[in-house]
Amino acid sequence: MRQVRPFEENSLSLSRIQMEKVSAVPLWQRWLSPHELVRDKERAGEIHILDTQLFAEEISTIYSSKQTKSDQRAALLSLSKVKLSEGRKALEVGLMRDRDGAVYVGAHAILIDQLIGGLVAAAENYVFATKARFALMAVGGYGRGELAPLSDIDLLFVMPQRHKKSDAEFVEFILYMLWDLGLVVGHASRTVHQNIAAAGEDLTICTSLLEMRSIAGA
């Protein structure tokens, strides 16, 4: 069997240039904050995940059409499925090319951030025509900015102290869209005071709150 020499390019190894690129930042540092690692790459123009401006324009086109609300929701769901599928495929191609797991999990988290952000904006601008009164936070591993291919998406809706029926309807709209996209979503809705109380009673909740990160909303 042919022996593969160090740095020889094949389907299972990295080229010398790729190795130097990957090792430029210490491995432990890359995994410490993959979300920020990918954000830096975005700002440098090295990686592109979701064209958020185009996504917003396509959503606007859906809601400017003379369709029923049901048809508009179906069109939004269909568009979101395309964005999710295309984004994940691009991440898979990048992973197979660069063999960089830290970039993958960070970029996957950002893809979901941007997708959820687009859905919240659609709800604010068209579905409910009012700003969200809750803060939508990523928690757990997703909050750390690490999202493996089949990981749960853990969300926390930080509700206003005096919330209304419309707030619950807004939350339900987002959750049902995510579920219909085929995503596995763990979620909780609590006020600030309820979060503090829950963190004092449950260590798991406490640690998840330590890793929370804002995605959208108030």
Region roles according to the model:
Residues R2-A218:
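A nucleotide- and high-energy phosphate-metabolite-utilizing enzyme signature
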